[in-house]
């Protein structure tokens, strides 16, 4: 990481409270802080779009896609299904590589399960942490972790999924 543009949500507390500390940490590691995505794009080969507010991702991603640079979008891809679909349509329009995933897909244990090291997997109980964020629907923030684990282990042939939640956190 050579440069960063530290713009995040102005309405999600877990975003705006952390950004000043993140800026200091990355600056201490020699990362240049830029004043815009346009300035950032002049300095990097690819973009890690880490804004935790999916409502901003479409606008931010389109700017990256127009540059043709590779873009990784952290969860949630978009705040709504419509935003997520629009993001992938815009990536296709600009022929820009885009990727989003939970890091849990790549954990050694999940890869061993996926690769059959413990035999054929017939079913899975997968859990995700969940923090309610009123600006995003349902499991928008953390649901990806359980879904990625499920599909990493089971593949794309999953026939049914049940979900549950608890008010105990």
Residue ranges and their predicted role:
Residues 35, 42, 55, 59, ...:
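Short, contiguous clusters of charged residues that form electrostatic/catalytic patches at enzyme active sites
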Residues 1, 57, 70, 130, ...:
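Histidine-centered active-site/metal-ligand motif
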Residues 13-17, 112, 136-139:
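Short aromatic-enriched loop/helix-cap "lid" or pocket-rim segments at secondary-structure transitions
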Residues 35, 73, 100-102, 162-165:
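Short loop/edge segments at beta-strand edges and connector loops
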Residues 1-67, 89-94, 155-156, 166:
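N-terminal glycine-/serine-/threonine-rich beta1-alpha1-beta2 phosphate-ribose binding loop
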Residues 72, 77-136, 146:
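A contiguous active-site-proximal alpha/beta segment in oxidoreductase catalytic domains
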Residues 1-2, 118-121, 158:
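A broad structural signal for short, well-ordered beta-strand segments within beta-sheet-rich domains
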């Amino acid at each position: 990481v050579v440069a960063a543009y530290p713009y995040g949500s102005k309405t999600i507390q877990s975003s705006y409270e952390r950004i000043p500390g993140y800026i200091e940490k990355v600056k201490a590691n020699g990362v240049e802080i830029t004043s815009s995505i346009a300035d950032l794009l002049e300095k990097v080969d690819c973009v890690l779009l880490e804004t935790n507010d999916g409502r901003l991702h479409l606008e931010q991603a389109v700017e990256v896609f127009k540059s043709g640079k590779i873009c990784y979008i952290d969860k949630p891809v978009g705040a709504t299904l419509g935003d997520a679909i629009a993001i992938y349509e815009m990536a296709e329009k600009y022929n820009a590589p885009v990727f989003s995933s939970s890091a849990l897909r790549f954990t050694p244990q999940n890869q061993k399960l996926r690769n059959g090291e413990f035999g054929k997997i017939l079913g899975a109980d997968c859990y995700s942490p969940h923090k309610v964020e009123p600006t995003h629907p349902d499991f928008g923030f953390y649901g990806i972790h359980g879904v990625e684990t499920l599909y990493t282990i089971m593949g794309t042939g999953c026939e049914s999924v049940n979900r549950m939640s608890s008010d105990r956190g």
